[in-house]
């Protein structure tokens, strides 16, 4: 309620003035009580809100812990992390709201009470004091006798001075009242308006935040619906399988009895057996036994290192034991000791005895073949299928994938945080990672990083060789080029996961630390290729190589290149022979005088796609990684070179590792050039057996025909390349077998898998054995 005190009434000091003062003073006292109460309620609200934010933050930490626990499930980890980050932003918005509430309500209203109302109270005290003095002066003036002239003058002077002081203080008091009445409205409304604007900002920020999250939540909902459908289908399948298993007759043994001498994981047979201890009590303990790598080993728990019972099965024998009380026993005897074992049934005992005997025979056979294979290794006419067992033996006895990869410069520590002894790798980037950073990489998606264990997963030879061609030092020189310049601190092994995650996303997803390429000083069309005229003599000599992008030998990049070779050609002789071979196949004929040799600019002047295209031919893996970091499209098409792709260029360059690198980074194995030839066509024409094997394993379409109506098989038959013909026919036969067996057929014939595995091993470790096509022709007069 607004009450205005009139200045005229103030001078009169009338009863109306006194009544107005009394009303104003009561109103101000009530206002003070209301404001004090509101401030206390505001403080309680802010404290409660901060407690809510603290509890909410603890809840967010719980979600993050759950996300970290689910690091092996990319869907759960990614979504929980994103949701926790969003809710953390809402907590921040709540804290901002409470801070603004404290400033707008608590601070402003407390200031009004402590300053403005306090001034009113001080003015009231002075007014009451001078009013009392005036009343005393009036009473004294009235009591003075007429005949006492001296007292009359003194009383009159005091009364005059008191009235003058009263009027001055009364006017100040009235002014303070009117100012307070006017100011309180603006102060109260201003604080409330500021409070409401704080809420407006809070809800607006929340709306914007969840508007961005909306499509993501919608996509997740669709994924959950699909997961529910898949879960229902899996449940039905499991119930059906459960019913089928229940209907089977398990009156006999319920343990798998098969053994496989050529198992991919090297384990011939495994299962539980009782083992008699060698102590004085001869106790029997149940352990998990396995036959692997020509050894008999056992372990109690999976995390325990296997205990070797027999180091070399060739030095032992196995026999039945019928002279002891326990049933189903057999004994494995070596020159130094014997081991008494017991199976659960007679069938299992016979299976184990047969598995040990077969493993002994296999070990002797492999040992006997070693000398013959060593002799055949030096012969140029050695069959391509003869070295498969040798290669497998070499890998079994050689260094492990972990040892080979970690010996590359920089690979002994995590590429992103520096933790020692990393046991995970990103195979498309070519780096080693610790387990925490590998979980973050896995959350990025396979289009950014493909994570694999160096100790738990199997490694194909071409992939292992790719890891040895790159390494942390090479990749960090590309992806951390501007790290010091930008002043960014690299995470340490002890850094928080959130800090590592932000750094890894900035490094590989946003590529913030990659050195930007300077703008080329040529037009976009000219930046693709620069054509230089050549003499007729130069054209004649370079004609066979025009399809290879015809890069001059002197223009080779000085940077590090892959040591991999798919064709084992020398600098001069093999190129000349290869050109004549290609001409004989009539698939790479010159297209008249229009084709000319192309010379590239420095890589800094190339667009990323052309940079990748050039580096793929030159077998320059660091340059290829740099081009991808600069945004090169892995399936970039060079319109000036018959729509060839980097993968086709890698085939022409003759590097198996380069092809593997492009495939790991998403290269399409079936994209064809202007003449209808894909990578498989080009590899077949050039006689690159290892590349043909790689492309077939990656799903290359061998039925596709080029503009001449030739598929890869007809090209290989025409060129009389026995190895490639064998691979193509085996792949086609395996494909037909799978189609005939239907959905539940076997994934592939064992012979097919063994042969392709042998070819992969030879292409990576002994490529010279796959070059019979070139070698036999070069020996012709």
UniProtKB/Swiss-Prot annotation:
InterPro entries: ACAP1/2/3-like, AH/BAR_dom_sf, Ankyrin_rpt, Ankyrin_rpt-contain_sf, ARFGAP/RecO, ArfGAP_dom, ArfGAP_dom_sf, BAR_dom. Residues 399-521 form the Arf-GAP domain. ANK repeats lie at residues 642-671, 675-704, 708-737. Residues 365-390, 520-576 are annotated as: Disordered. Keywords: ANK repeat, Cell membrane, Coiled coil, Endosome, GTPase activation, Membrane, Metal-binding, Repeat, Zinc, Zinc-finger. Residues 1-226 form the BAR domain. It holds the Pfam family ArfGap. GO terms for molecular function: GTPase activator activity; zinc ion binding. Residues 266-361 form the PH domain. A zinc finger (C4-type) spans 414-437. Residues 365-378 have a biased composition (Basic and acidic residues). GAP activity stimulated by phosphatidylinositol 4,5-bisphosphate (PIP2) and phosphatidic acid. It is a peripheral membrane protein. It is found in: Endosome membrane; Cell membrane. GTPase-activating protein (GAP) for ADP ribosylation factor 6 (ARF6). PANTHER family: ARF-GAP WITH COILED-COIL, ANK REPEAT AND PH DOMAIN-CONTAINING PROTEIN 2 (PTHR23180:SF241), CENTAURIN/ARF (PTHR23180). This is Arf-GAP with coiled-coil, ANK repeat and PH domain-containing protein 2. The lineage of its organism: Eukaryota, Metazoa, Chordata, Craniata, Vertebrata.
């Amino acid at each position: 309620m607004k009450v205005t005190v009139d200045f005229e009434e103030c001078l009169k000091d009338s009863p109306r003035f006194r009544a107005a003062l009394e009303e104003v003073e009561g109103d101000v006292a009530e206002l003070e009580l209301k404001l004090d109460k509101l401030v206390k309620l505001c403080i309680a609200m802010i404290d409660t809100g901060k407690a809510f934010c603290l509890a909410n933050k603890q809840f967010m930490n719980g979600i993050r812990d759950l996300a970290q626990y689910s690091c092996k499930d990319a869907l759960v980890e990614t979504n929980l992390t994103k949701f926790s980050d969003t809710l953390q932003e809402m907590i921040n918005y709540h804290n901002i709201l409470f801070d603004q509430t404290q400033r707008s309500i608590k601070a402003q209203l407390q200031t009004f009470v402590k300053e403005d109302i306090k001034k009113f109270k001080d003015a009231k005290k002075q007014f009451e004091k001078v009013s009392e003095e005036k009343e005393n002066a009036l009473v004294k003036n009235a009591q003075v006798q007429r005949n006492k002239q001296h007292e009359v003058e003194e009383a009159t002077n005091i009364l005059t001075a008191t009235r003058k002081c009263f009027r001055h203080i009364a006017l100040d008091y009235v002014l303070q009242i009117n100012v307070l009445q006017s100011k309180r409205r603006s102060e109260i409304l201003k604080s409330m308006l500021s409070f409401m604007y704080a809420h407006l900002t809070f809800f607006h920020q929340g709306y914007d935040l969840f508007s961005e999250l909306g499509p993501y939540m919608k996509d997740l909902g669709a994924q959950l619906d699909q997961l529910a459908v898949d879960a229902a289908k899996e449940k039905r399948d499991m119930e059906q399988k459960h019913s089928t298993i229940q209907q089977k007759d398990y009156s006999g043994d319920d343990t798998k009895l098969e053994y496989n001498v050529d198992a991919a994981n090297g384990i011939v047979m495994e299962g539980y057996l009782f083992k008699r201890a060698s102590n004085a009590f001869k106790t029997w303990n149940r352990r998990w036994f396995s036959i692997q790598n020509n050894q008999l080993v056992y372990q109690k728990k999976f995390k325990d290192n296997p205990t070797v019972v027999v180091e070399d099965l060739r030095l032992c024998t196995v026999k039945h034991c019928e002279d002891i009380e326990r049933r189903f026993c057999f004994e494995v005897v070596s020159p130094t000791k014997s081991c008494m074992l017991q199976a659960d049934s007679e069938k299992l005992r016979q299976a184990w005895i047969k598995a040990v005997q077969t493993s002994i025979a296999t070990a002797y056979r492999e040992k006997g073949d070693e000398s013959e294979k060593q002799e055949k290794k030096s012969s140029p006419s050695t069959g391509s299928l003869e070295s498969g067992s040798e290669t497998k033996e070499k890998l079994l006895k050689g260094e492990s994938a972990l040892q080979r990869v970690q010996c590359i410069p920089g690979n002994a520590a995590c590429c992103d945080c520096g933790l020692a002894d990393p046991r995970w790798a990103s195979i498309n980037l070519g780096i080693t990672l610790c387990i925490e950073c590998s979980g973050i990489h896995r959350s990025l998606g396979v289009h950014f990083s493909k994570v694999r264990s160096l100790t738990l997963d199997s490694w194909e030879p071409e992939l292992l060789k790719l890891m040895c061609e790159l390494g942390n030092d090479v990749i960090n020189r590309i992806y951390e080029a501007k790290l010091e310049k930008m002043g960014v601190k690299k995470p340490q092994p002890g850094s928080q996961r959130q800090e590592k995650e932000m750094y890894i996303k900035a490094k590989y997803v946003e590529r913030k630390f990659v050195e930007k390429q300077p703008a080329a000083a040529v037009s976009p069309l000219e930046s693709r290729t620069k054509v230089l005229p050549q003499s007729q003599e130069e054209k004649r000599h370079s004609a066979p190589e025009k399809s290879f992008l015809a890069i001059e030998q002197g223009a080779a990049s000085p940077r590090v290149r892959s040591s991999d070779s798919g064709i084992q050609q020398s600098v001069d002789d093999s190129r000349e022979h290869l050109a004549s071979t290609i001409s004989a196949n009539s698939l790479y004929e010159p297209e008249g005088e229009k084709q000319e040799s192309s010379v590239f600019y420095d890589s800094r002047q190339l667009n990323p796609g052309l940079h990748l295209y050039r580096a793929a031919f030159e077998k320059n893996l660091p340059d290829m990684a740099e081009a991808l970091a600069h945004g090169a499209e892995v399936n970039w098409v060079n319109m000036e070179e018959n729509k060839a792709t980097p993968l086709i260029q890698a085939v022409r360059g003759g590097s198996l590792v380069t092809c593997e690198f492009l495939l790991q980074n998403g290269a399409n194995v079936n994209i064809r050039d202007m003449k209808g030839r894909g990578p498989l066509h080009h590899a077949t024409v050039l006689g690159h057996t290892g590349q043909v094997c790689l492309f077939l394993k990656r799903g290359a379409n061998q039925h596709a025909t080029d503009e001449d109506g030739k598929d890869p098989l007809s090209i290989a038959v025409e060129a009389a390349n026995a190895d490639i013909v064998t691979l193509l026919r085996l792949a086609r036969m395996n494909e037909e077998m799978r189609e005939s067996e239907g959905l539940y057929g076997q994934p592939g014939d064992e012979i097919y898998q063994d042969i392709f595995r042998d070819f992969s091993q030879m292409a990576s470790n002994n490529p010279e054995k796959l070059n019979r096509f070139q070698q036999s022709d070069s020996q012709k007069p």
